[in-house]
From Swiss-Prot:
Transmembrane segments: none annotated. This is Argininosuccinate synthase. Homotetramer. One of its GO terms (cellular component) is cytoplasm. L-citrulline binds at residues 95, 131, 135, 183, 267, 279. The keyword Iron does not apply. Signal peptide: none annotated.
Amino acid sequence: MLERETMSDQNRLVLAYSGGLDTSVAISYLKERTGKDVVAVSLDVGQGGESLETIKQRALACGAVEAYVVDARDEFANEYCMKALKANAMYEGVYPLVSAISRPLISKHLVRAAHQFGADTISHGCTGKGNDQVRFEVSIASIDPTLKAISPIRDLSLTRDVEIAFAKEHKLPIVQTEKSPFSIDQNVWGRAIETGFLEDPWNGPTKDCYSYTDDPAFPPVEDEVVIEFKQGVPVKIDGHDVTPLQAIEEMNRRAGAQGIGRIDLIEDRLVGIKSRELYEAPGAVALITAHQELENCCLEREQHRIKRDIDKRWAELVYDAQWFSPATQSLNAFIEDTQKYVSGEIRMVLHGGRAVVTGRRSDSSLYDYNLATYDSGDSFDQKSSNGFIDIYGLPSRVAAARDVKFGNGIEVPENSVE
């Protein structure tokens, strides 16, 4: 739990503030409906758009008594994206947890702001049918169970029509722009697109759905890249040192130019419904592809089998709002231990929507050329396989003998060759 460093005992509320119409109206609306002064909290997790200073000034102009803004890009990349990378996190085998891994970080800063400014309630802008309401509120409760959480959309009937009328009535300094037909959430790890005509799963996505990726049907010349990892973390690209944030940003640019990382699926939401989702995650998909191949080289067979199961469960837990849970923390410990030998280089060709591994090398690889080769330098004693097969096949032979004894042996067709 974060330590409290309260600077005020006023009755305050902390709002997760994006700078858009919804949360700008929510500042005055929450004040009017709850009687609490509002502290606006904004994080930069690589979503682009307006500067934090612009967002801060808008929050204050809309009635916030304080504005807490944080450039959290490196924190997000180092502590959240890299955990997802080490876990090869793909919910339902496809989705790299673009939104799911940002919510615990945002929640942590919401709680920190609540402690700093003396708030007893945290507000978010989630609807009552999405995953994020659960992620925010479970994360907040995991950090500080004494804080309350509300949603103006879910709990206070703040609809779009009410927002516009409220903004006009109160002369809020908001310029309403043309509303996108989609609901979009984005950060440096990727971009999520939903609603609008996409809610009919038969409708194909149009080119205006995409922003992080170019059309893979018309790619530029293929792009060869070498990524060096140290204990599961990318540290160099084409020989140049990179931080985790820089690695993600560069692969977003290069893989995105090739149309890599476009995802279209029907997804099982935590709240029990299925939803149609589009995602763009060029950097995440390319980095996970490279990381998985390096693990193929460096993890022992049984360890690797177990880790694949753990990776799947980790993605499910994080998707299901369990980032801070004891179960996830235990899985983190296992995953981190597996990464101590996951160091080396992966060469990939990026082209036409695909990231294809073409080379791998590692000083800690378990691939032994002398054991694997079929040439004269082979050091594998093939005669050893005779005894291995006898022992390995013993349970099957004993069971087969029992089946034959009781008339249940496997039938072999006779005279099958004419």
